[in-house]
Amino acid sequence: MASLLNIRGLSVSFGGVPVVRGLDLRLEKGRTTCLVGESGSGKSMTAFSIMRLVPEPGRIEAEAMLFDGDDLLKLPEKAMRSRRGRDISMIFQEPMTSLNPVLRIGHQIAEPLELHQSLSRKEALEKAVELMALVGIPDAAKRVNDWPHQFSGGMRQRVMIAMALACSPRLLLADEPTTALDITIQGQILRLLSRLARERDMAVLLITHDLGVVAEAADDVAVMYAGELVEQAPAVEFFARPLHPYSQGLMACAPLLGNHGAHRLPSIPGMVPLPSELPEGCAFGPRCPHFEERCRQPQLLRETAPGHSVRCWKV
């Protein structure tokens, strides 16, 4: 299957300090890839680099970042700006801070339609109503004139999805889209994203730290730690046989996934290292129960089974 997005050797740094290191990632049409890891692992910065929205003084470097054959890092800024929202769209973490509190919901959904599709305000608002209905907002024709504060957290997140889908993007980046939502609404949003990915033949990169979200939504899983990809596999294979010690630790810490009964959940000791204080060799080494001397040497991401790669000497 041809990749919609093919990233090779992506690195992001600030003042010479790397926050993403040599990342390779392929995203396929109609599939949802979950990028999982603790806070500080480089997940969000990976998404921002795809959008070319890494804040200054951040520096993006890569062998290639091919989107449908075009290298995004070589596009002029004007050409990249036209890609954002039209071909590549993003759902941000906090819908209340991402929505403009002094603009009606309909106008915010209509804006990318007016910009990228040259629709009139009337036509764009009519399309906004259709999009609101598509993402499950009831009474869309009435609510299109409401303000952001009149929507619940779950409904605001649906508005953000409607905005992201307005121009029918081929790639959707979703950065922790369900973090602030209760478990019922979270499930609804995840099922909605998965359904839209299939129906629209759209590639989705879903960023999360929650393996429950991964189990609900993922076709493929990519695990990041300290700026590196440490494991990548189809979701079914990943949950059946996680190989990297970090992946195994995350699984053991997840309720209902690797732990049963009334016992206290285990935790992974220590913290993700600061980008400026990375250890030699395996970045997970200081927290790993299987650490040995050779783990101080650099390790490559190796394929251990079709589609399943891991960065660990022990595998």
What is each model feature region?
Residues 5, 20-22, 83:
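Conserved structural motif at the start of ABC-family nucleotide-binding domains
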Residues 166-170:
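A short, proline-enriched helix->beta-strand linker immediately N-terminal to the Walker B motif
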Residues 109, 161, 185, 189:
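Hydrophobic anchor residue at the start of the ABC signature
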Residues 38, 173, 177, 181-263:
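P-loop NTP-binding/switch modules centered on Walker-like glycine-rich loops
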Residues 54, 59, 72-89, 107, ...:
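ABC ATPase NBD coupling module
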